[in-house]
Amino acid sequence: MKNSQKSILAIGGIGILVFVSAFGGIFLTRNLGKTAKTVNMEEASAVIERYAKKIGATQAEVIKSAVELADTQVDELPDIDKNEVTIQPVTKLYAEIFSTYEKCGKGKNGWMNEVAEKFNQAGYEVDGQPVSVMIRNVASGLGMDYISTGKYVPDGYSPSNDFWGKMLLADGIFMEEISSGLVNNTAGILLSKDTQEKLTKRYGSINLKTIVEATAGGEFAMGYTNPNASATGLNFLISTLQTYNAKEPLSEESVEGFQAFQTNVPFVAYTTEQMSKAAETGSLDGFIMEYQTYINDPGLTRKYQFTPFGFLHTNPLYTTRDT
């Protein structure tokens, strides 16, 4: 009996040793032939999997890009060097002009750059001193903020329309109008051809009121530019308010109407330049833009239809007190 017990214990002990040896061998050799990177990835994946089991996900409500129409403070303005100088002066005595993208951008949007270059090459003098000009690309509203806060005041200012100059004058800031309009431009809404066809079929015609109502109803994805910075955006804001109440655009009816529209706007660009780049992705059914930018872009004219709205963009030119 004792011998049988000893035999059973011996066999059991041998079995345990064999199991331990086998398991130990597998454990010690599990990473043989694998690189350190592979081993680390496997270990990391295992850790992530353990944590992932403890995480629960919920679907958040989508928040649209509402714009707060608050006053701009001087400390919120970017350093002036963040705004590109598109034409450098060639003399010690020069005048700096704030201009907008559609005048000092690239290609056909850079006609003011071409004029400035020719001026700088002409060798003009004032009181016997050689003079030149510097052009800086600054959005209409941002330029007004620099001037009104006094953070940076240029010698000349050419926004896309005269709203900005009128606001500066209304605030008691000296501005002398050199030209009421350097060149005329038109604000408009671009709609994809499918969207244009769909809205025409539903509403009978395409106009600002139709587009605003369709956007407020969530019928298509519309983008617009920030009215604090963009002349086209400000034009759109004023024109939209007037579609609800032409006599009192700041009435409760108008404000509520615009808020309903804005709730269904998925994208607000800071400037027309940003809107133009965003349009290249094809993610928007409609957005606002000036005609000059639209007509000079074959990609836009091929995909979208232009519907004009609002006030004329005359591109005035002002000088400031320091000039």
Describe every region a protein language model picked out.
Residues 2-16:
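N-terminal Sec-pathway targeting helices
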Residues 12, 33-229:
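N-terminal segment of the mature folded domain
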Residues 23-37:
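Hydrophobic single-pass membrane-insertion segments
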Residues 181-188, 259, 295-322:
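Periplasmic-binding protein-like
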Residues 194-203, 229-230, 242-250, 322-323:
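Short helix-loop capping/hinge motifs at secondary-structure junctions, enriched
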Residues 236-239:
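Extended alpha-helical scaffolding regions
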Residues 242-306:
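Ligand-binding pocket segment of bilobal, Venus flytrap-like solute-binding proteins
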